[in-house]
Amino acid sequence: MNTETLITKDQQDLWNIMQQINNCWYKGQPAQLAEYFHDNIVFNSPDLKRQSTGKDICTQSYIDFLNSSKILLYKETNPVVHIFDNTAIVTYEFEIKYEQKDKVYHETGTDIMIFNKQENSWKAVWRSLANLKSA
């Protein structure tokens, strides 16, 4: 993981939060995601045509994925963190390989997560994927 672009402590803190979020689902504890999500978080489909709203629904999407998938590979690269007062945008490239119903999928793309700082705590408020490709 190249984190040379993460210069400030706040940028590094946000990247650490993003990694904690990913560790929750990747390591099989997706219910813990709720502590990182704002109550009204919005997940967008990669084409931005569909949305899921709310901490419970978005957390459940990870649970459903893990219940139907076996993760074979997951990597994050090129993190970028932009901070604007109480708003932050975290992006990174990812590669994932997983199995569902005896079929293996291999995808790459960019994850985009927007955070809002409330009472000295960063909460994820918006997420989407971009550049999603089957490898």
Stretches found by the model and what they are:
Residues 26, 96-100, 115, 132:
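Beta-strand elements of well-folded, non-transmembrane domains
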Residues 1-39:
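Short, low-complexity N-terminal intrinsically disordered segments enriched in polar/charged residues
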Residues 15, 30-83, 105:
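A solvent-exposed, acidic/Ser-Thr-rich amphipathic alpha-helical stretch
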Residues 5, 101-106:
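A short acidic/glycine-rich loop-to-helix N-cap element
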Residues 108-135:
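Short beta-strand edge/turn micro-motifs at domain boundaries
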Residues 81-88, 115-121:
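A short, structured loop/turn motif at beta-sheet edges
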Residues 37, 94-96, 128-131:
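Short beta-strand segments enriched in hydrophobic/aromatic residues
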Residues 21, 62, 76-81, 94-96, ...:
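Hydrophobic/aromatic beta-strand elements that line small-molecule binding cavities or substrate pockets
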